[in-house]
A protein has these predicted regions:
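Unchanged
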Residues: 39-64, 69-122, 139
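Acidic/histidine-enriched, glycine/proline-rich intrinsically disordered or flexible terminal extensions
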Residues: 131-136
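A generic fold-level signal
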Residues: 1-3, 11, 27-28, 74-77, ...
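Conserved N-terminal beta-strand and adjoining loop/helix that marks the start
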Residues: 1-18, 36
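Conserved beta-strand and immediately adjacent loop positions that scaffold enzyme active sites
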Residues: 7, 32, 100
Length: 139
């Protein structure tokens, strides 16, 4: 079964927004830091999906459409990565899905785990984020 997802790399003041995923065994990388976004609904474009997911997960709509950055293929999974600016302070976001959200620096991204203020513990970065982190560190 082919599966497509669309994820958002959102930057604000030199830091990137991450989501601490729920601790649910039914999801990919439970309890790991990842990007906001999710699956494509039937007949939905990747761009439509990433914008819908941002509303559903953090109640935020970008002022301008996010830019398609790259697409990766891993077996039956196609991941569309979008990039753009987070135009509001993180405190203005409403976390509706996941355990925490955080703006992270390049230094934190290199460490492999990130501290969660809400959970009061460090949690690992999702292994699937490797490609995104490598590209961010090159920029």
């Amino acid at each position: 079964m082919k599966r497509e997802v669309a994820l958002a790399v959102l930057e604000r003041n030199g830091a990137w927004l991450l989501q601490l995923r729920d601790d649910l065994e039914s999801i990919l990388y439970p309890g790991h830091w990842g990007l906001f976004g999710g699956h494509l609904d039937p007949d939905e474009t990747p761009s439509e999906a990433v914008h819908r997911e941002l509303l559903e997960e953090i109640n935020w709509k970008p002022a301008f459409p996010l830019e398609h950055w790259f697409t990766s293929q891993n077996g039956p999974r196609t991941t569309h990565i979008f990039r753009g600016a987070l135009s509001v302070p993180v405190e203005q976001l409403t976390l509706l899905e996941g355990q925490d959200l955080k703006l992270t620096s390049k230094y934190e991204l290199r460490q492999g785990s990130i501290w969660s203020d809400r959970r009061s513990e460090a949690r690992p970065i999702a292994p699937g984020l490797d490609q995104v982190i490598k590209r961010l560190l090159i920029d």
